[in-house]
Regions:
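Extracellular glycan-interacting surfaces
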Residues: 1-264
Length: 264
């Protein structure tokens, strides 16, 4: 869907605008220096638009054989991108060094099968804004991965540190303090020591709704983090929570209408 009037009205982007009628869009990413240039990951690869979503074209590259669930662009070097794939296609973290023109597989490994979803899927990729070689990848349902060398080698975060393999999303705030935020099924974990230790924020105990999905750091205000939740999936209601202190305290934001589904 696309709105050209700040969200008052919405229209479906269809085949007339270049997107195949049965394409299932899983993620969006906006070029940090060219706000009209948008990437859309889907079950056919990656579509791109250079006119703020009015028209689209399908990029021809190896990702055409994969379902793309997540995208990340380095804010300092937009030519550096990562794409995560999965269900029903293999789980891979791809890397591009030329703005998405070409892609290569990184060495990240994932389980072939996992509970609930079958083939795991990369549901979140976060590039550390203070160190572009540090990337965090969340996999549903196969845990959290981290690379300190731009994707050449990877480590798996121990299950005892984050006792939930069902990763929904991940973000990194520059802080201070620099904070890694990991969204899991029914909770959120934060780390201020680059993943050495983790702390639960207690979603079930402290929030009205207990099914978190989306996480976003506000550009230009790294201590401000937004979290989207629902009652379940697909759910019957949702909300947006905001933290102004890098995840220590949260407030529910008012919405103009009551959502009828979980917010992703």
């Amino acid at each position: 869907l696309r709105s050209a009037d700040a969200g008052d009205n919405w229209n479906r982007v269809g085949i007339g605008q270049g997107i195949h009628s049965d394409a299932v869009i899983r993620c969006l990413a906006v070029h940090p220096d060219k706000p009209n240039f948008i990437y859309a990951g889907c079950d056919k690869g990656i579509y791109t638009s250079d006119d703020a979503g009015a028209t689209w074209s399908l990029s021809e590259n190896p990702l055409n054989d994969y379902t793309v669930w997540s995208l990340a662009i380095d804010g300092q070097d937009p030519d550096l991108m990562y794409a995560g794939t999965g269900t029903p296609t293999p789980t891979v973290c791809f890397r591009s060094r030329d703005g998405g023109s070409t892609w290569e597989k990184t060495s990240m490994e994932a389980a072939a099968e996992c509970p609930a979803v079958g083939t795991p899927r990369v549901t979140g990729i976060a590039i550390d804004p203070t160190d572009a070689k540090s990337i965090w990848v969340g996999i549903e349902v196969d845990g959290l991965r981290h690379t300190a060398d731009g994707g050449d080698t990877w480590t798996t975060i121990d299950y005892s540190d984050i006792p939930n393999m069902d990763i929904h999303n991940v973000a990194v705030s520059a802080g201070p303090p620099k904070t890694v935020v990991v969204v899991v099924n029914h909770d959120v974990y934060t780390s201020t020591d680059n993943g050495t230790t983790w702390k639960s924020i207690g979603v079930r105990e402290g929030f009205d709704l207990g099914y978190p999905r989306g996480i976003k750091v506000q550009p230009g205000s790294p201590n401000v983090i937004f979290l989207t939740l629902g009652d379940t999936t697909p759910g019957s209601t949702g909300c947006i929570m905001r933290s102004k202190d890098t995840g220590r305290n949260w407030e529910r934001l008012p919405l103009p209408v009551e959502p009828n589904t979980a917010m992703w």
